[in-house]
């Protein structure tokens, strides 16, 4: 039986909950072993496998003291049951070594055939905010 809308949304929300734990292990705990994530930047496209995602999280922890993402409005959630995709419009908040982080992003999830794990992620970020944030990090050595 194909996963229902509710199944797909529940898996995407579980991913967000694990993402908010913000550890290399938690961010992959709801992903398939061969899953990939794609960052959607016009100038910074990146595709990461599980190991690369864990490394990116470990590196981000050097900058972020805390990070939380949350669905802005459940009414804006888009679900395509046929392709097993869920789209969330998210707010992200955090404390960093250079001050507050506050932005919005969009995550597109494609689930495994049973709907219980995330197989692919496309993450779109506010590039203007990212550029400004990265300029605050200029000159800082980790």
UniProtKB/Swiss-Prot annotation:
Q: Where is this region: Substrate?
A: 37-39
Q: Name one GO biological process term.
A: terpenoid biosynthetic process
Effect of mutating residue 48 to A: Leads to a dramatic decrease of the catalytic activity
Residue sites binding substrate per the record: 19, 39, 48
Q: What is the effect of changing residue 37 to V?
A: Does not significantly affect the catalytic activity
Keyword flag Protein biosynthesis? no
Q: Where is the chain membrane-spanning?
A: none
Q: Which UniProt keywords apply?
A: Isomerase
Q: Name one GO molecular function term.
A: isomerase activity
Q: Knockout: what is the outcome?
A: Impairs the synthesis of terretonin but accumulates terretonin C.
Q: Which domain of life is it from?
A: Eukaryota
Annotated pathway: Secondary metabolite biosynthesis; terpenoid biosynthesis
Record EC number: 5.-.-.-
Q: What is the enzyme's class at the highest EC level?
A: isomerase
Tell me the protein family, please: Belongs to the trt14 isomerase family.
Q: What does this protein do?
A: Isomerase; part of the gene cluster that mediates the biosynthesis of terretonin, a fungal meroterpenoid that acts as a mycotoxin. The first step of the pathway is the synthesis of 3,5-dimethylorsellinic acid (DMOA) by the polyketide synthase trt4. DMOA is then prenylated into farnesyl-DMOA by the polyprenyl transferase trt2. Methylation by the methyltransferase trt5 then leads to farnesyl-DMOA methyl ester which is further subject to epoxidation by the FAD-dependent monooxygenase trt8 to yield epoxyfarnesyl-DMOA methyl ester.
Subunit architecture: Homodimer.
- Name it: Isomerase trt14
* Origin species: Aspergillus terreus (strain NIH 2624 / FGSC A1156)
């Amino acid at each position: 039986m194909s996963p229902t809308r509710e199944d797909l949304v529940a898996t995407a929300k579980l991913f967000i909950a694990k993402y908010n734990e913000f550890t290399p292990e938690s961010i992959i705990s709801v992903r398939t072993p061969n899953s990939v994530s794609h960052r959607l930047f016009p100038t910074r496209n990146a595709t990461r496998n599980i190991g690369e995602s864990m490394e990116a999280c470990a590196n981000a922890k050097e900058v972020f003291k805390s990070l939380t993402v949350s669905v802005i409005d459940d009414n804006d959630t888009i679900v395509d049951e046929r392709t097993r995709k869920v789209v969330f419009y998210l707010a992200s908040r955090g404390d960093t070594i250079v001050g507050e982080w506050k932005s919005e992003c969009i995550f597109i999830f494609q689930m495994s055939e049973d709907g219980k794990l995330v197989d692919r992620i496309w993450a779109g970020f506010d590039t203007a905010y990212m550029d400004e944030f990265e300029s605050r990090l200029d000159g800082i050595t980790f």
